[in-house]
């Protein structure tokens, strides 16, 4: 089992420009790599609030961080960040928010969670095991058109229709209940394999995103972040595929442009009503980090700052 390694750890912490007495949110606790580093930069007066959908992560946080009075974790989605910030009484006073998107290594490496097409396990893929719908429900119950749409929209799978039909044909014989069973069906239906990529990669990603409503949650979270942050507060987001990064990039671009008038209206940049700016360029892992942790290879970090 791979050791959990926080991706772009130093770059994201630097991007948050942590104040010793500041208030911070780690929207994706995982196994606490980023949280631990944030706490290392805080004084006794600093506060860190963490969020995670996964009850295993929440329990880990309580076991390893529970005695730290600066720390508190909420069970739920980062799409509830405004609600949690309100409960904590810190709306509009937060100095930084970190989001490290996607599935965590402990989830991916545990066969029982059903995220991996390389490990035999139940077809589950729920980040939050308290939710009712899992991957098996979707794979065995969705119409062929819905399957194809999800594979195309969330996996950018070229052969979405062909794979969807193969799944529907297979489940007529018996329900599809395991990861390797699904992976084999996808593999056989995929006529052209990408170099250095398992043929089921895109389909598994698509199902995971759909089951966990990952992109919807991301959009909802980003829209709440500016209300949660105080003036000068930083937002740091690490994404792992183009769908996530596109949402983050577009959000930051739109917020930086503010209430932009029609092109024909002459107006200076300084006169635009905006309360957000991008900080620096997108950051990618160094080759040394990729060598040490191959899962970091597609990571992109984007940072922004609330102005007022």
UniProtKB/Swiss-Prot annotation:
<feature type="binding site">
    <location>
        <position position="78"/>
    </location>
    <ligand>
        <name>S-adenosyl-L-methionine</name>
    </ligand>
</feature>
<feature type="binding site">
    <location>
        <position position="52"/>
    </location>
    <ligand>
        <name>S-adenosyl-L-methionine</name>
    </ligand>
</feature>
<keyword id="KW-0808">Transferase</keyword>
<dbReference type="GO" id="GO:0071424">
    <property type="term" value="F:rRNA (cytosine-N4-)-methyltransferase activity"/>
</dbReference>
<dbReference type="GO" id="GO:0070475">
    <property type="term" value="P:rRNA base methylation"/>
</dbReference>
<dbReference type="InterPro" id="IPR023397">
    <property type="entry name" value="SAM-dep_MeTrfase_MraW_recog"/>
</dbReference>
<dbReference type="InterPro" id="IPR002903">
    <property type="entry name" value="RsmH"/>
</dbReference>
<feature type="binding site">
    <location>
        <position position="100"/>
    </location>
    <ligand>
        <name>S-adenosyl-L-methionine</name>
    </ligand>
</feature>
<feature type="binding site">
    <location>
        <begin position="32"/>
        <end position="34"/>
    </location>
    <ligand>
        <name>S-adenosyl-L-methionine</name>
    </ligand>
</feature>
<keyword id="KW-0949">S-adenosyl-L-methionine</keyword>
<keyword id="KW-0698">rRNA processing</keyword>
<dbReference type="Pfam" id="PF01795">
    <property type="entry name" value="Methyltransf_5"/>
</dbReference>
<keyword id="KW-0963">Cytoplasm</keyword>
<dbReference type="GO" id="GO:0005737">
    <property type="term" value="C:cytoplasm"/>
</dbReference>
<comment type="function">
    <text>Specifically methylates the N4 position of cytidine in position 1402 (C1402) of 16S rRNA.</text>
</comment>
<comment type="similarity">
    <text>Belongs to the methyltransferase superfamily. RsmH family.</text>
</comment>
<dbReference type="InterPro" id="IPR029063">
    <property type="entry name" value="SAM-dependent_MTases_sf"/>
</dbReference>
<keyword id="KW-0489">Methyltransferase</keyword>
<feature type="binding site">
    <location>
        <position position="107"/>
    </location>
    <ligand>
        <name>S-adenosyl-L-methionine</name>
    </ligand>
</feature>
<protein>
    <recommendedName>
        <fullName>Ribosomal RNA small subunit methyltransferase H</fullName>
        <ecNumber>2.1.1.199</ecNumber>
    </recommendedName>
</protein>
């Amino acid at each position: 089992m791979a050791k959990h390694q926080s991706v772009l750890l130093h770059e994201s912490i630097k991007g948050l420009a942590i104040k010793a007495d500041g208030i911070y949110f780690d929207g994706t606790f995982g196994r606490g790599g980023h949280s631990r580093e944030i706490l290392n930069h805080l004084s006794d007066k600093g506060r860190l609030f963490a969020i995670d959908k996964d009850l295993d992560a929440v329990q880990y946080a309580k076991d390893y961080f529970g005695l730290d009075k600066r720390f508190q974790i909420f069970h739920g989605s980062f799409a509830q960040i405004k609600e949690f910030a309100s409960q904590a009484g810190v709306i509009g006073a937060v100095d930084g928010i970190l989001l490290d998107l996607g599935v965590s290594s402990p989830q991916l490496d545990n066969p029982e969670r059903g995220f991996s097409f390389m490990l035999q396990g139940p077809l589950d893929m729920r980040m939050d095991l308290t939710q009712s719908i899992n991957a098996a429900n979707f794979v065995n119950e969705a119409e062929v058109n819905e399957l194809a749409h999800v594979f195309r929209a969330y996996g950018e799978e070229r052969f979405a229709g062909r794979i969807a039909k193969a799944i529907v044909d297979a489940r007529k014989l018996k329900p599809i209940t395991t990861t390797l069973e699904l992976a084999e069906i996808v593999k056989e239906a995929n006529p052209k394999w990408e170099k250095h990529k398992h043929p089921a990669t895109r389909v598994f990603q698509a199902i995971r995103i759909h089951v966990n409503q990952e992109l919807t949650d991301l959009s909802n979270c980003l829209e709440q972040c500016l209300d949660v942050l105080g003036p000068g507060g930083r937002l740091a987001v690490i994404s792992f595929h183009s769908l996530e990064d596109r949402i983050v990039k577009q959000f930051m671009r739109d917020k930086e442009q503010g209430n932009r008038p029609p092109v024909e209206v002459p107006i200076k940049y300084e006169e635009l009503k905006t309360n957000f700016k991008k900080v620096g360029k997108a950051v990618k892992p160094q080759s040394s980090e990729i060598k040490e942790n191959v899962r970091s290879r597609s990571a992109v970090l984007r940072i922004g700052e609330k102005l007022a």
